[in-house]
Design a protein with these regions (language model features):
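ABC ATP-binding cassette signature C-motif
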Residues: 1-184
C-alpha cells in the first residue's frame, strides 16, 4: 500500500529548475532519507510534500489518515513557555477532548433525558479515545522522551528561550516524537 505518491513533479524558482519530472512512491514500512548539500532543495521538497508549498506541476497524494511530522528548521519556540509545556502541546488534541468531556459533565444537571443520553454517549466516546491514546500516561511519556534526549538534565521547567540552539532543536524533536506521526 502506498503512503505517498509523487507524480511528474516540477518546481523551480525563476529560471532555476530545482525538481524536474520527479516521480516515486513510498510504501508502508519503507525508510527513506533525504540528503543533499545546502541550498539544493531539501526544505523546498519537504514543503511541497507536506502541502506548505504547491509544486509548479505534478501531483502529491497522501493516503488517507496518514499523520506527517516535519521539523521545520526555522521553527520558533514561544517565550515564557517551559520545556514541559512545549512537550505537552504534542497532546493538545487530547487536552481539548478532556475539556469537552468535563464541560458535558458540568452541564448534565440541566439536560433533558434525550440530551443526557447523547451527552453520555459522547463522554463515553471521548473517554475511550483518551484511554486509547494514553492520556493518563502523558507526563510519563514526556519524562521518558525528555530523558532520552537529555532534556531532563537541562530541567523541564526551564524557559525555552533560555536554551541554546541545540537544546531548542532537541525540544522540537522531542515534541515531534511525542506526536507519534506515521511519517517523520
Amino acid at each position: 500500500m502506498s503512503i505517498l505518491i509523487v507524480k511528474n513533479m516540477n518546481h523551480g524558482f525563476g529560471d532555476r529548475a530545482i525538481f524536474e519530472d520527479v516521480s516515486f512512491r513510498l510504501l508502508k514500512g519503507e525508510h527513506v532519507g533525504l540528503i543533499g548539500a545546502n541550498g539544493e532543495g531539501k526544505s523546498t521538497f519537504m514543503n511541497i510534500i507536506t502541502g506548505k508549498l504547491m509544486p509548479d506541476e505534478g501531483d502529491v497524494q497522501w493516503s488517507n489518515k496518514v499523520r506527517v511530522g516535519y521539523m521545520d528548521q526555522h521553527a520558533q519556540l514561544e517565550k515564557g513557555k517551559t520545556i514541559r509545556e512545549v512537550l505537552r502541546e504534542a497532546f493538545q488534541y487530547l487536552f481539548d477532548m478532556e475539556v469537552e468531556m468535563n464541560g458535558l459533565y458540568e452541564r448534565m444537571g440541566e439536560m433533558s433525558e434525550d440530551e443526557m443520553t447523547k451527552a453520555l454517549e459522547r463522554t463515553a466516546t471521548i473517554q475511550d479515545m483518551l484511554d486509547h491514546n494514553g492520556f493518563y500516561m502523558i507526563d510519563a511519556k514526556v519524562e521518558e522522551v525528555a530523558a532520552g534526549l537529555g532534556l531532563r538534565d537541562v530541567g523541564l521547567d526551564k524557559d525555552v528561550t533560555d536554551l541554546s540552539g541545540g537544546q531548542r532543536t532537541k525540544v522540537l524533536l522531542a515534541k515531534l516524537l511525542l506526536e507519534t506521526p506515521d511519517i517523520l
